[in-house]
Amino acid sequence: MKRIFSGVKPTGHLTLGNYLGAVRRWVDVDQHGADALFCVVDLHALTVDHDPARVRRLSRQAATLMLAAGLDPELCTVFVQSHVDEHARLSYLMECVATDGEMRRMIQYREKAAREQQRGGSVRLSLLTYPVLMAADILAYGTDEVPVGDDQTQHVELTRDLAVRFNQRYGHTFVVPRATRPEVAARVMNLQEPTSKMGKSDDVGPGIVYLLDEPEAVRKKVMRAVTDSGRDVVYDRESRPGVSNLLEILAACEGGSPEALSGAYASYGALKKDTAEAVVELLRPLQERHKALCAEPGYVEGVLRDGARRARELARPRVDAAYRAIGLLEA
């Protein structure tokens, strides 16, 4: 049985992009015979300035939304990264086979470091080594497949390189994973800046649809979405990013392809209206389940506790084997 691992970082409220590009896909894979682990990667949220209380609150909210989206703890493992010490243990070993040059070539590091410096802040070492911890997250479980968006593909490629390098130097220890991506909506873009990702870490704004937005707020954001200078509804990511983003969102909500849907609309207004309603209907059952789960906090805590216990049982033997392989004495 193949093993799947993926995670979500609690740096902001989960967005439509997180759902279409990640969480909904998790619900699909965990029902089809895969051994799937889904994680709130809270350690990754500490790489920038943060409010501790907010990280805890967003971690709990992310876990609740994952369950509300349809993840079944009877069929998959849902847990919090910091509850499983093996992630941090293995991360140091991965640092011992990674190079400084590899870390500095990571696109996300360069972009985030540049933004931090523009704000006059200092860049934390943990931001540079973020991909190493991500590699440890993946490799600790013998992961075969990692469902990711386009922006994380480079990190999975690094994970593959580190696994191969470790295996060559110290003996076969790790499964070499591969990234999997959805055909549609792998990267939902900001409705006001359609060349930028709809990121949960961004400031609150009209271009971001959050999973817990009220229906009227969703409609308002979609109807005010930036389109393009042309008048025809044409799917072309390069020259028509605004309308293409709406078509991809609609296709992800209702099925079909963006190209086929483009031929069904004669105006931007009609496309926006249908897209807005499709998003509202997509989020409605998730929001209802989220409300019900919030009324049972003990249930969510129990799921996370049981998930962490199983995750430790899976990760510990492989991490212990890596410690032996690299030359460390057994305790």
Swiss-Prot record:
Residues binding ATP, per UniProt: 9-11, 17-18, 149-151, 188, 197-201
Classification via PROSITE patterns: AA_TRNA_LIGASE_I
Gene expressing this chain: trpS1
Record keywords, A-Z: Aminoacyl-tRNA synthetase, ATP-binding, Cytoplasm, Ligase, Nucleotide-binding, Protein biosynthesis
Subcellular location: Cytoplasm
Subunit structure: Homodimer.
Keyword Cytoplasm: yes
Primary role: Catalyzes the attachment of tryptophan to tRNA(Trp).
Record GO terms (molecular function): ATP binding; tryptophan-tRNA ligase activity
Amino acids binding L-tryptophan: 137
Protein name: Tryptophan--tRNA ligase 1
Motif position, 'KMSKS' region: 197-201
Main location: cytoplasm
Annotated catalysed reactions: tRNA(Trp) + L-tryptophan + ATP = L-tryptophyl-tRNA(Trp) + AMP + diphosphate + H(+)
Pfam families in the record: tRNA-synt_1b (PF00579)
Motif stretch ('HIGH' region): 10-18
One GO BP: tryptophanyl-tRNA aminoacylation
Keyword Cell membrane: no
Domain of life: Bacteria
GO cellular component terms attached to this protein's record: cytosol
Family to which this protein belongs: Belongs to the class-I aminoacyl-tRNA synthetase family.
Organism: Streptomyces avermitilis (strain ATCC 31267 / DSM 46492 / JCM 5070 / NBRC 14893 / NCIMB 12804 / NRRL 8165 / MA-4680)
EC numbers, comma separated: 6.1.1.2
